[in-house]
């Protein structure tokens, strides 16, 4: 068993705990790492509760988020687990995409049932595209009435279904993070059951390599006698030489063929997700393409100008604006590699947005961008970031 540490073949899955601030997310996170350490000591490190609870401040795109990362393994998988203890931290984390989750454990205290914050977290999880949620009915040791537990479970399932998660099939496990940390066998087993459910219910993530090819263009130049080369970092997928591609965004969609792929001045047959490469494009002139467009597998993504988004506006302390903004505010929206001006419309009933606020908004860009739901962007003003958001719905 001692060799298990060096196994690199296990699927890696990013998960997190979400839910109301006082329902025991952090205690449960600590319990998971302790229970798995006791069960598989050669796969896991011992972590104490204090290191998770004192979540370090991280700065993501200049936004301060208190968040802690814990790693642990089951026999089946390697997990990275994020716990954002504060409500505001969780919201910022989800909207800015600081931690992309492949699935999440919704922690609901059996003593309280779902609260307004629980609902908000589930809604956000759907909007940013978390694929699967399962439920830890935490503090279950404190509820002796079986009927009450069943009632809370029903309520949670209805909440999941109302946000298009699978309320009927999602595992709901009764846990007690505190009792599991204390070593109570019944509740240690509840945490083991929870992780078995996570192993089974959260699907293996589709690796970026298996998605359709997409490379944002960072630079364009001409190689005399050969043609136009675009460079950038492939975001996802793979691309073979002589493949047809589309150039999407800013202007009309153009079709072309990739006749050469180069990386660090070496010729390649194929470009992979995560690699910086240059693509030689057949029949296109230097002026036909520009930074901010994307090179994609044909038909895989379309250009759009109008969308709805969830946005976090930086506070003054984070280097954001000093004063509020209103509808018709026209900042730049930075998508992947370029800024495009857009006009903001605030939702009905929202007169203005203050620095430090989270808001929904509708945006109309002056040029189309290759867009899909879940795509992140920064809002900039005079070259500095004043907000960060995600596309929740494409409207045109």
From Swiss-Prot:
InterPro entries assigned to the protein according to its UniProt record, in alphabetical order: EF-Tu_GTP-bd (IPR041709), EF-Tu_GTPase (IPR050055), EFTu-like_2 (IPR004161), EFTU_2 (IPR033720), G_TR_CS (IPR031157), P-loop_NTPase (IPR027417), Small_GTP-bd (IPR005225), T_Tr_GTP-bd_dom (IPR000795)
Residues of the tr-type G domain: 10-206
G1: annotated segments: 19-26
UniProt keyword list: Cytoplasm, Elongation factor, GTP-binding, Hydrolase, Magnesium, Metal-binding, Nucleotide-binding, Protein biosynthesis
Residue span of region G4: 138-141
Keyword Membrane: no
Gene Ontology cellular-component terms listed: cytosol
PANTHER family on file: ELONGATION FACTOR TU, MITOCHONDRIAL, ELONGATION FACTOR TU-RELATED
Function: GTP hydrolase that promotes the GTP-dependent binding of aminoacyl-tRNA to the A-site of ribosomes during protein biosynthesis.
Name this polypeptide is given: Elongation factor Tu
Organism: Micrococcus luteus (strain ATCC 4698 / DSM 20030 / JCM 1464 / CCM 169 / CCUG 5858 / IAM 1056 / NBRC 3333 / NCIMB 9278 / NCTC 2665 / VKM Ac-2230) (Micrococcus lysodeikticus)
Gene this protein is translated from: tuf
């Amino acid at each position: 068993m001692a060799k298990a540490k060096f196994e690199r073949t296990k699927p890696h899955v990013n998960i997190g705990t979400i839910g109301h601030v006082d329902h025991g997310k952090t205690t449960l996170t600590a319990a998971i790492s302790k229970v798995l350490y006791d069960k598989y000591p050669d796969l896991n490190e011992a972590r104490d509760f204090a290191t998770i609870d004192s979540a370090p401040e991280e700065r993501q795109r200049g936004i301060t988020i208190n968040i802690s990362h814990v790693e642990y393994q089951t026999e089946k998988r390697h997990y990275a687990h994020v716990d954002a203890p504060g409500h505001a931290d969780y919201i910022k984390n989800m909207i800015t995409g600081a931690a992309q989750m492949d699935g999440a454990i919704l922690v609901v205290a059996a003593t309280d049932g779902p609260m307004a914050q629980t609902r908000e977290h589930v809604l956000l999880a759907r909007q940013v595209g978390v694929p699967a949620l399962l439920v830890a009915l935490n503090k279950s040791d404190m509820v002796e009435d079986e009927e009450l537990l069943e009632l809370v479970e029903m309520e949670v399932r209805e909440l999941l279904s109302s946000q298009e998660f699978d309320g009927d099939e999602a595992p709901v496990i009764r846990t007690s993070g505190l009792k599991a940390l204390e070593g109570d066998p019944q509740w240690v087993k509840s945490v083991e059951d929870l992780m078995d459910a996570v192993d089974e219910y959260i699907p293996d993530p589709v690796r970026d390599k298996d998605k359709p090819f997409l490379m944002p263009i960072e630079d364009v130049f001409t190689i005399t006698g050969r043609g136009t080369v675009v460079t950038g970092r492939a975001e996802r997928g793979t691309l073979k030489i002589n493949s047809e591609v589309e150039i999407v965004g800013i202007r009309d969609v153009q079709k072309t063929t990739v006749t050469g792929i180069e990386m660090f001045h070496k010729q390649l047959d194929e470009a992979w997700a995560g690699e910086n490469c240059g693509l030689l494009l057949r029949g296109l002139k230097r002026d036909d393409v520009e930074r901010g467009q994307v090179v994609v597998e044909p038909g895989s993504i379309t250009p759009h100008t109008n969308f709805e988004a969830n946005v976090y506006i930086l506070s003054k302390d984070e280097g954001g604006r000093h004063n509020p903004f209103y509808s018709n505010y026209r900042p730049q929206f930075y998508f992947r590699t370029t800024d495009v001006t857009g006009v903001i419309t605030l939702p009905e009933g929202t007169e203005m947005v203050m620095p430090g606020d989270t808001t929904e908004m509708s945006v109309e860009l002056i040029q189309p961008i290759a867009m899909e739901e879940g795509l992140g962007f920064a809002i900039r003003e005079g070259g500095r970031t004043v907000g960060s958001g995600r596309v929740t719905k494409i409207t045109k």
